[in-house]
Amino acid sequence: MSEAKPKAKVRAPKINFETKAFWDATAQGKLNVGKCDDCGEHYYYPRPLCPFCFSDKTRLAECSGNGVIYTYSVTMGKEPYTIAYVTLAEGPTILTNIVECDFAKLAIGQKVKLVFYDTGEGSAVPMFTVA
C-alpha cells in the first residue's frame, strides 16, 4: 500500500483499547477487517462479535486493499473531496474517501486501491484512489 500526500491536514483518530490494533496496523500500511473463524465472513468495522453469526471467535484479517466504488458523492467547496462507500474484494463495504483523482471521471463500479494518509501523529488514515 502506498502513502498519499493530502491537500488538507488529516486529523489523527482517537485511539482506545478496542481500536488500538486496527490503528497500529494502519500505521504499518495495512488495512484490517474482522473475520469470523466460525462462519468465515469478513466484516467492517472490526469488533469482538461477528455481526453474521454472533460468534466470539473473531480476529483481524489483513485485506488486499482492492475494491470497487459502491456509491459516492463529491462535495465542492474550498477543498473539494469525495466521500464514498467502497466494497472491498473481501466483501465488506466501508465508508471512506476517494483521493488523488479527477472527480468528474469517477463511476459506480470503478476499481479502486488503498492508500494511506499519514496524520503526522503516529497513525495513518486509510483512503482509496482509482486503480
Identify what each model region corresponds to.
Residues 1-31, 130-131:
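A broadly conserved sequence feature marking short terminus-proximal activation segments
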Residues 37-40, 54:
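Cys/His-coordinated zinc-binding microdomains
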Residues 92-103:
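Beta-strand/loop nucleic-acid-binding surfaces
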Residues 72-78, 117-119:
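Short, conserved beta-turn/loop elements at beta-strand boundaries and strand-helix junctions
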Residues 30-33, 47:
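Residues immediately within or flanking Cys/His clusters that coordinate Zn2+
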Residues 101-113:
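Short nucleic-acid-contacting surface segments enriched for D/E, G, S/T with interspersed K/R
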Residues 67-69, 98:
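Conserved hydrophobic positions within beta-strands
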Residues 118-131:
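OB-fold/S1-family single-stranded nucleic acid-binding modules
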